[in-house]
């Protein structure tokens, strides 16, 4: 590995974000991805053990849930103010010279350093045109997360040196303190430290505020009537979930109810796997009922006319009077016969169809 290899340009791909902006990914070629992965397998065991224990993102044996649990513990200890820092376009603004300088302090192989530099300098292709890249380490390549941790670790160490309690996941960092005044001091410190790295804080998304109700990795903390600190799915994450379900259960396309459920299943189970850490059983029940409500509407549309609805409901064991009333009100079932339909198309009915549940 003498560092003479020249990587190909990465392909730009824009991923829409909930706020309407785009997250820019740089997708490397198959060959470059393999080389980056091999490089990662060599570097990660050497570098990862040097990182702060408060860093959780893209590290072996660490997950987002660990960062959320750490945040919960800090708040339980009485650190009720959070310094929530959002870095503006972090991966796009990484300074190459500063990053390479920090990497040299951990890796003394000249060939490796040259190869990493070559990947940083590789152009980015957009619409068939290759543009030179002077800064940034685009998301999409295997090396980018490790390099991000290399750059940000010195900020972690400064916070540790001052005795702060914090959790960082990639460029998302929350510091927990006991007072607003202490939080303002920490924010000023972080501005100085990030400025030295030529990184910018997104002031509109950063704040010194109450730790309760502040979104962190899709979760937020809340206090019960017994003063217990618990975890919940953030409101924005719930709304994003519902929006995705709306897309997956759109009533057009001619799909059977079984096909709709099959399309729904991977997303719901994946979402449940991530947010299963939340301590909000009532939210799960509410979202489950909301999903079943949409599925009932789809089922009625598939049955189309009143006679088919009547026949299908009878086949499911509904009393004739109930089936007749639902069929007669099929266009206004939500207002006139919602509870009757719920008594037929029950939770057990959707369980038999394989519909996943959150609760």
PLM region descriptions:
Residues 18, 47-51, 79-81, 95-98, ...:
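Short acidic (Asp/Glu) and glycine-rich catalytic loops that position anionic groups and cofactors
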Residues 206-214, 263-267, 284-292, 307-316:
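A glycine-rich phosphate-binding loop feature that marks nucleotide/adenosyl-phosphate handling sites
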Residues 30-31, 35-38, 72:
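Duplex nucleic acid-engaging cores and interfaces of nucleic-acid transaction enzymes
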Residues 3-14, 18, 50-62, 66-213:
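Conserved polymerase palm-domain catalytic core
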Residues 132-136, 230, 246-260, 271-283, ...:
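Short, solvent-exposed helix-loop connector elements
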Residues 294, 303-359:
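Extended C-terminal regions of large enzymes
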Residues 121, 191-192, 196-263, 267-269:
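A conserved non-catalytic segment of reverse transcriptases
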């Amino acid at each position: 590995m003498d560092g003479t290899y020249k990587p190909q340009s990465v392909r730009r791909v824009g991923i829409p974000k909930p706020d309407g902006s785009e997250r820019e990914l740089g997708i490397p070629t198959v060959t470059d991805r393999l080389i980056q992965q091999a490089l990662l397998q060599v570097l990660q065991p050497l570098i990862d053990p040097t990182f702060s224990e408060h860093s959780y993102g893209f590290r072996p044996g660490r997950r987002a849930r660990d960062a959320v649990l750490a945040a919960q513990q800090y708040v339980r200890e009485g650190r009720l103010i959070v310094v929530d820092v959002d870095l503006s376009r972090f991966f796009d603004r990484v300074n190459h010279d500063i990053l390479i300088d920090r990497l040299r302090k951990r890796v003394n192989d000249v060939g490796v350093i040259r190869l990493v530099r070559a990947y940083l300098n590789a152009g980015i292709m957009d619409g068939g045109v290759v543009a030179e890249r002077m800064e940034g380490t685009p998301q999409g390549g295997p090396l980018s997360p490790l390099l991000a941790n290399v750059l940000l670790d010195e900020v972690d160490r400064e916070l540790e040196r001052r005795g702060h309690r914090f959790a960082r996941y990639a460029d998302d960092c929350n510091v927990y303190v006991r007072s607003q005044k202490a939080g303002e001091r920490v924010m000023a410190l972080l501005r100085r430290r990030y400025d030295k790295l030529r990184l910018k804080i997104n002031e509109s998304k950063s704040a010194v505020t109450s730790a309760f109700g502040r979104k962190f990795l899709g979760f937020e903390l809340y206090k019960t009537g017994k003063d217990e600190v618990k975890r919940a799915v953030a409101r924005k994450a719930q709304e994003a979930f519902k929006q995705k379900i709306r897309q997956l259960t759109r009533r057009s396309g001619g799909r059977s109810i079984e096909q709709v459920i099959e399309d729904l299943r991977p997303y719901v189970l994946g979402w449940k796997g991530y947010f299963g850490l939340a301590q909000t059983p009532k939210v799960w029940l509410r979202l489950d009922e909301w999903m079943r409500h949409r599925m009932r509407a789809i089922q009625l549309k598939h049955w189309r006319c009143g006679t088919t609805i009547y026949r299908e409901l009878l086949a499911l064991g509904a009393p004739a009077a109930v089936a007749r009333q639902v069929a007669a009100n099929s266009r206004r079932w939500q207002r006139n016969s919602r509870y009757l339909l719920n008594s037929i198309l029950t939770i057990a009915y959707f369980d038999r169809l394989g519909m996943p549940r959150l609760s």
